[in-house]
Amino acid sequence: MAFRWRSLMRFRSTTRLLLLFTFCLTVIHSLGNDVDSCDKLHLGQYLCKEPRIDDATQEPETCKDRVAWVECLPAPNISCRLSNGTQFKFSGEEVGFNKTIPCRNVSGYSYKVAVALSLFLGWIGADRFYLGYPALGLLKFCTVGFCGIGSLVDFMLISMQIVGPSDGSDYIVDYYGARLTRLSITNETYRRMQPSP
């Protein structure tokens, strides 16, 4: 009976030591790996360079499939893991990671030209011919812009960028100019409830 009691006490003390050892290893491991990947830095911990803008398209030169890549520099004294797994402390001058930014698919149709054609020559359908809608352009030409009312409606639709080029691309708009962005509501959209008075 005494033998069982002693072996039970040894087992308990060994179990306690093993648990303490496991806990210490877990704490040391978690303290050593608190550095995240560089692409998971929070806003304010990095600064992304401005993309190089193509003069012809007014979009980033690296734009492909509506996405462009820019280089991001972590702030000074920020430590993070590079893509190859090494930990690095940045001085603010080194590139830490690349980030994607949205860009637009353009194919040569200028917004300024489309609005000017719609305003001055919309009554003969020049705007619709320019945007690639020859049937509507011919119809506007034959009806003198639907007696002016169609020209006014087309001018409003083109200036609000509702009517765009026929190939589905976007207008060429100055990169830092006034661009319209369509907002949509989906099932993931958060709606804040208004307090009732």
Curated annotation (Swiss-Prot):
Cytoplasmic-facing ranges: 127-143
Signal peptide: 1-32
Keywords: Glycoprotein, Membrane, Signal, Transmembrane, Transmembrane helix
Topology of the protein relative to the lipid bilayer: Multi-pass membrane protein
Domain TM2: from-to ranges: 108-155
Annotated compartments: Membrane
Superkingdom of the organism of origin: Eukaryota
GO CC terms in record: membrane
All ranges on the Extracellular side of the membrane: 33-105, 165-197
Glycosylation (residues): N77, N84, N98, N105, N187
Segments passing through the bilayer: 106-126, 144-164
Family: Belongs to the TM2 family.
Protein name: TM2 domain-containing protein 1
Organism: Danio rerio
